[in-house]
Design a protein with these regions (language model features):
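ABC ATP-binding cassette signature C-motif
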Residues: 1-186
Length: 186
């Protein structure tokens, strides 16, 4: 499936922008996100991005989470500067109780993985320049949604979100929408 052939996609994203990507199924939303992340390369045309760019991609599988690590180990692996007690306080704030700290991440639900990815965001030594969130409100409960919205709202970097949840879009302060219609940007 080739996208944007008749009308090449021309898109500029500035540092600190908060953007929503919209479009019907098959319009190229996931393809665009993968191009921006660098996990997919364009078959034609050119893609320019600031380098180096530290990106946190919150896909629907939460692939940023290492399923072999424990919940606590996940945070410990991404920071050398935060003391143990600060990591545990953060886990509690994100509704991870002490019995869950030794749980393998592979056994977590989607909502739990999302919350853990957000914890990583707050403790990692290298904060991301860009967060890309692909349908982040799917399959999460209301308390997890509140945590997600508050965390993304307080994030000061560039934010790209694919979501059909209008309330969530307002809550995180989206400033601009890019609509992909018939495989082209509007």
């Amino acid at each position: 499936h080739i996208l944007w052939v008749d009308n090449p996609l021309n898109l500029t994203i500035f540092s600190g922008e908060r953007i929503r990507i919209q479009g019907d199924n098959g319009s190229g939303k996931s393809t665009l996100l993968k191009l921006i992340c660098g996990t997919l390369h364009p078959s034609s045309g050119e893609l320019y991005r600031s380098e180096p760019l530290n990106i946190l991609y919150l896909d629907q599988e939460y692939s940023c989470i290492d399923n072999d690590l424990t919940v606590y180990g996940q945070l410990e692996a991404c920071t050398s500067r935060k003391p143990e007690h600060e990591l545990k306080i953060l886990l509690n704030r994100f509704l991870f109780t002490p019995p869950t700290w030794d749980k393998k991440c592979g056994s977590l639900s989607g909502g739990e993985k999302m919350k853990l990815a957000l914890c990583r965001l707050l403790v990692c030594d290298n904060a991301p320049d860009l967060i890309i969130a692909d349908e982040p409100t799917n399959n999460i409960d209301i308390s997890s949604m509140d945590i997600l919205a508050a965390t993304l709202k307080s994030y000061e970097g560039t934010l790209l979100v694919v979501s059909h949840d209008e309330h969530f879009i307002r809550d995180v302060g989206i400033e601009r929408a890019i609509k992909l219609l018939n495989a082209q940007a509007e």
